Amino acid sequence: MPKDKWEQPIQPPPPLFLGEKERDLVKQVNDELIERVIGQQVLYYPISAEYTNYHPVYGEAINKNFLSPVRVYALIEWDGIETTTANYGLDKKYSMTVHFHKRRLTEDQDLYVREGDFVLYDDDYYEIVTLKEPREIFGQAGKSIEISAHCIKSRRGNFDAE
């Protein structure tokens, strides 16, 4: 085969400017932007897996025990109020989406967001009902940058941290 003929490489070349240093730079910029410029924060109440009595078959717990709250800087997206009519009158559901910086939580604060945990925002408690990881850094598979938690306001008496 002649030397001047092009051959298809077996693997694509590694990314030129998208390595570990660039991901660290993005983390540093996001940390500074979220904490020092935007400054929105929530108190995160993680469930204590050690002291909560889970059902052996269903994996659910009637009474949950929580660890001490952790202050977390995040981006808060207010979803608004949804009003529905039920048999007994109107029902209002307040919801918001909390966008957590994944590497800041897992690497620096050793915190893992889970469904069923609670957050305190603006003197109201919200329960995390769904989680998503919608964005990847530079489009690289397995390198998500954000955890989005959809939260619904908890009714009085359902959760009380005091």
Identify the role of each PLM range.
Residues 110-113, 120:
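Short, well-ordered loop/turn sites that connect or cap secondary structure elements
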Residues 102-108:
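Mixed-charge, Lys/Arg-rich low-complexity intrinsically disordered regions
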Residues 1-93, 97, 101, 137, ...:
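N-terminal disorder-to-order initiation segments that are Gly/Lys/Arg-biased
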Residues 74-78, 118-141:
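Short beta-strand and beta-hairpin "edge-sheet" elements
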